[in-house]
Amino acid sequence: GKSYLLFNLFYDHLLASGIPEDNIICIALDDVENEAYRDPYRLYSYITERVQDNREQYYVLIDEAQYAIGKEEMKNPDEPIRLYGVLNSLLRKNNVDVYITGSNSKFLSSDVMTEFRGRGDEIHISPLSFSEFYPASGQEKSDAWRDYLYYGGLPHILTESGGEAKSRYLENLNKEIYLRDMCERYGIRDEESMLILMKVIASAIGSLSNPQKISDTFRSSGNKVITMPTISSYLKYLQESFVVE
């Protein structure tokens, strides 16, 4: 996943490129030991204290940056997100490069494009392709292909044994991470309808999504009536969160 790419592969690349270890600042905000740095201003103070020599280049690696975004900041679009101000301040320093990871449903592409005003670039981390999945699976090719089609290419799937465990992992991931994050970010109160919408879309993979037809599907199946504008908004949220394309 993204944490491994940041703290292992990229970290090792920096060392191999001759960057001193003291010039690489790593902070995993999901680690309880770093809980204090979820306050953006304390995070800024810690980093600037580590950047001692203006003549040297420093690399700041922050994992799970969404932990430094408050719930009220997330819910209220008019509330300034302090973390973004901190990151912009770091980016203004000529000798500091910043690399961050974040939950895709909280740390949005639109934020990168608007808040960092040309200072930020995105790197999308996709699930494994089958050419990556197959050799790591240790299965016969036909069995690996069957599992890949059914369960997808999230790396953690390879660590789960048995279909029940894989299905449980995916269900928990969807409900506890994607769905919860989107509801918090966009102030969605009707979590059940969003979950049903996700199931409707999943049942028609590869088909064009028509908000009016989806609304009619809700109505005909005896679910809650959801208007076409609401469906359109929900689809937009799902796209921004990289749940659908």
What are the roles of these predicted feature ranges?
Residues 25-56, 81:
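Short glycine-rich substrate-engagement loop in P-loop NTPases that contacts/grips substrate
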Residues 61-62, 89, 97-103, 124:
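Structural recognition of the conserved hydrophobic beta-strand(s) that form the central parallel beta-sheet
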Residues 122-160:
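Amphipathic alpha-helical segments of the small helical/lid subdomains adjacent to P-loop NTPase cores
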Residues 66-99:
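Conserved Walker B catalytic segment
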Residues 105-121, 136-138:
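Short regulatory helix/loop adjacent to the ATP-binding pocket of P-loop NTPases
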Residues 163, 167-245:
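Accessory nucleic acid-recognition modules appended to NTPase machines
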Residues 5-9:
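Hydrophobic positions on the alpha1 helix immediately C-terminal to the Walker A/P-loop
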